[in-house]
Amino acid sequence: MLRYFVLFAALVLQGAAAFAAGVSREVFPLERGGVQLHLERYQVGEGEKTPLLMAHGLTYSSHEFDVDYGDYSLARFFADNGYSVWLLDIAGYGRSQKVQDGFMPNSDYAAEDIAAAAKRVLELTKAKKVNVLGWSWGTVTSGRFAAKYPELVDKLVLYAPIVAGLVKADVTAPFNKNTWTHAAGDFQVKADKTIDYDVMEPPVAATFLSNCWRYDGEGSPNGGRRDLLVAPNERLIPTAQVKAPTLLIVGDKDEYVTALLCQEALKTLPKGSELKVIKGGAHAMMMEKPYYKAFREAILNFLKK
């Protein structure tokens, strides 16, 4: 099954994309603590744009926001809607400089990488504040960033928020061994455990998987994984300290978080915060055919309020 994706990926990457023609991409130098970080802007046209900084999840880097097949790319969607979209790779991930200690870029460390990126974005755009969107582990890192640096954040979007520890387990290896099977682990499956192609189009899956291999290779840091694999009664996002209006958006089939946990978190967030539950959506719903449009429209509507 995964062999099909590898063979199909070359064709996919050559295919036309809905936003490709009008979106410009530019990489901006960024260094923190002696580590070179990859910070890339997606934008349509010139002039003032509202900045939106995206924080990736565990294991795989910011390319997950640019699944450039059809109109699935989240980064290009928001660029097409008037935002300057900024993708950051945390230290040790993707196109950022590799690290010797895979436990070093944990959640608190990553939050400081996000802070460095946010300050750089504000310097470049002359905006007063930045909007931030985090996915999965990126909700922990961006949530901690927003709590510590409220003066930098306009609105916060926590997509598939890892509100609490997943399960207590020891993480002893500093780096995760990446595999094709692991990269496909967030795709919805049928009863026989094969990928549900009614939910995830084969070219979308192929694009995502080929990018995982291209940008993330055979390993990624495990500091964040060690943070997440703690007891379920441990809260990971300091929502009570967040001052920015926040959107919690989750699929009701997400295996990592429940709507109940999100409702609990919502009660601690400031006025103007919201919870949106996408029925049928799972952890990777930004790539799921029945749900990706409703997902991103909900985010766009929240940011424009």
Residue ranges of predicted features:
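Catalytic histidine-centered segment of alpha/beta-hydrolase-like enzymes
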Residues: G281-Y292
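Alpha/beta-hydrolase
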Residues: V167-I249
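Short substrate-entry loop that stabilizes the transition state in hydrolases
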Residues: L58-Y69
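Conserved alpha/beta-hydrolase
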Residues: Y72-Q97
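Conserved alpha/beta-hydrolase "acid-adjacent" motif
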Residues: E255-L261
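Short beta-strand element of the alpha/beta-hydrolase
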Residues: K49-G57
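N-terminal cap/lid segment of alpha/beta-hydrolase-fold proteins
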Residues: A21-G47
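Alpha/beta-hydrolase active-site loop
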Residues: M104-L124
